[in-house]
Amino acid sequence: MNILSCSTNILNGFYDISGVEVGQHFYWKIGGFQVHGQVLITSWVVIAILLGSAALAVRKPQTIPTGIQNFFEYVLEFIRDVSKTQIGEEYGPWVPFIGTIFLFIFVSNWSGALLPWKIIQLPHGELAAPTNDINTTVALALLTSVAYFYAGLAKKGLGYFGKYIQPTPILLPINILEDFTKPLSLSFRLFGNILADELVVVVLVSLVPSVVPIPVMFLGLFTSGIQALIFATLAAAYIGESMEGHH
């Protein structure tokens, strides 16, 4: 009963987290729900960039790739290596998921530094990278949780739940709690790093000449790429762990 109560409290915590606000927001009413309009706008822009780039890469495929096709093949090989290292020999079906997560986060993070979001005026709030909003990072983390639950159940069936009493039933509460702390750590790590990076750049631009924050912006681009890699690597590791049952 205590475990059920604890799980309910954690789920309620996720709901509260999704309502965390940093600055002003532009809201849309969809049915009976209130959503962050600027997050949807910037997410659609990122998705459009990814789809447009992919369309250009496969428009005229060549045996010896060049240009954007060569770049995407390099990215695909990189994602395959990450997936194989973390998941194992059964990595194949999960490459599209890990790749989508990585590319969406990577482009979202970089868009915060490279795209002139500020010139677009909204009735309330302002546009920023999608990963600058806790709703986006929590959604990505919960999607990862669904993925590794599905991977474990598809591989082991109901026997997957046996992991909660390994190596001893005494660890049952801790093993259950772990499934809630994983998405929490994923979402807060990504959200905190991207928000902090954008805030630092904004503060420096307001305090010093525009040329001074440029090194910080380059450092932010590097950090943003690393955060995308960390998220994708951990997602693959969690999926591999659920399939193998290793802790």
UniProtKB/Swiss-Prot annotation:
InterPro entries: ATP_syn_F0_a_bact/chloroplast (IPR045082), ATP_synth_F0_asu (IPR000568), ATP_synth_F0_asu_AS (IPR023011), F0_ATP_A_sf (IPR035908). It is found in: Plastid, Chloroplast thylakoid membrane. NCBIfam families: ATP_synt_6_or_A. HAMAP family: ATP_synth_a_bact (MF_01393). Belongs to the ATPase A chain family. Key component of the proton channel; it plays a direct role in the translocation of protons across the membrane. This is ATP synthase subunit a, chloroplastic. It comes from Trachelium caeruleum (Blue throatwort).
